[in-house]
Amino acid sequence: MKPTKELLNEILHEVRPLIGRGKVANYIPALARVPAHKLAIAVYTNQGEVIKAGDADEAFSIQSISKALSLTLAMGLYQPDEIWRRVGKEPSGQAFNSLIQLEMEQGIPRNPFINAGAIVVADLLASRLSAPRQRLLEFVRQLSGETHICYDKVVAASEMMHSDRNAAIAYLMRSFGNFENEVIPVLNNYFHACALKMSCVDLAKTFSYLANKGVSVHTDQRVISPVQTKQLNALLATCGLYDGAGEFAYRVGMPGKSGVGGGIIAIVPGEMTIAVWSPELDPSGNSLAGTKALELLSERIGRSIF
């Protein structure tokens, strides 16, 4: 079965009762103000068709979903060993902003999708790009075809004001020799990436290269190689949902990346890219209703990588 607008509307109707059972991220004040009732899903097929339902054109803070975009940029700038000697490829099983594991493993983050790993990627970008923030924005606008996409400066400033833990992570890595640039400018770039504002339609178009062997469906341009696409999807499948990655693989069965803004992207290699949004989170920091929507979609259309 293929996804249809009717099916997407049906799924949103089924998951809407979950709203009220999760919690909107409140440690970033600007995110705490997002209305909890928002709900959206968008599918972008490898034939270039958009199928959507709910608030699919409304932009929101993508937060950690941006980590997959930053890693994609880094993969185009560095040889594999230059990246993977500084950050691992294993699930962490710890909170996404944990310091304990980082200390025990001598400043090498478990994977590029927890905060420590994404901060290392931001450091890598700062070493090779004169204006990493502008480059990321241009990259996203190009892939989505939407020039209106921008950083939410209020969210970025809010995160910078509440950045003590992430700063501690960066300085701890620097103490182990795993940091090259000044900490504060790198953190500023990292928070701006998290503060990208995009809709589900924007996200589904942007990440279409992961469903199409590294070639953007929207622009028909190669973003990364087929091998890099396989590697990135593998990391998304094992590490993309914080310490809920196993649960997500079990229920949804697709490579994915979540953010505490309530968004999740999911990939069906060779077929489609999916984005969902519902701001209320489960205890792992993943969208509660969004995860359920992806689970139902996976079941109804019979798609899974397993």
Curated annotation (Swiss-Prot):
InterPro entries: Beta-lactam/transpept-like, Glutaminase. This is Glutaminase. GO terms for molecular function: glutaminase activity. GO terms for biological process: glutamate biosynthetic process; glutamine catabolic process. It comes from Vibrio vulnificus (strain YJ016). Substrate binds at residues 64, 115, 159, 166, 190, 242, 260. Its EC number is 3.5.1.2. Signal peptide: none annotated. Belongs to the glutaminase family. It catalyses: L-glutamine + H2O = L-glutamate + NH4(+). Keywords: Hydrolase.
